[in-house]
Amino acid sequence: MGLVFLGPPGSGKGTISKIISNEFKYQHISTGDLFRENILNSTALGQEIKKIVERGELVPDLITIKIVEDKIKAIKKNKDFILDGFPRNICQAEALDKFLPNVKIINFLIDEELVIKRLSGRRICKSCNNIFNIYTLTTKKNGICDVCGGDLYQREDDKEECLKTRLKEYKLQTKPLIEFYSKCSRLNNVDASVKIDEIKKKIIKIMLKKN
């Protein structure tokens, strides 16, 4: 079975991907990871992607589709997987339907203010990279890592103004995609503002549901 996870940054889809992957032996396929893997292995596509990224451009649909299709074909037959970060637009969605027509689409719904609170509160240790949150996972000493005692910092792209820009771009990019899947009654919406266990239960129900 194939699952497609759609949702803005901070919606929890990355966390849920790890949980489903570990508990149900699904393979987590991220386009970002595939790009890095191809660049690291210096494949023909990887070399092309590296040049594109170094120019500050977006990787074209044809390359993204090719990399995802190759990865899915390379997976052992009947292996379950989660697609994270693909498709991102109608062109990619139509291509996915051609080589993999029966995936389940799960859309993580969450209020923008909650996303901003979640991500703007994130703090990362400079020494050990452990992640904390000033709202949901506080440290004993303000600004100090509980694990190694290192200093905590806030990533530039976790600052409120940057987050608002990222969320605006996400909405513009995915709105046509959401409409595309809604029209053919394939979209499964999940409330991502609740606790992780509740989200997991809802996704398991979707996984068990017949197409």
Swiss-Prot record:
Keywords: ATP-binding, Cytoplasm, Kinase, Metal-binding, Nucleotide biosynthesis, Nucleotide-binding, Transferase, Zinc. GO terms for biological process: AMP salvage. Zn(2+) binds at residues 125, 128, 145, 148. Pathway: Purine metabolism; AMP biosynthesis via salvage pathway; AMP from ADP: step 1/1. Belongs to the adenylate kinase family. Monomer. This is Adenylate kinase. The gene is adk.
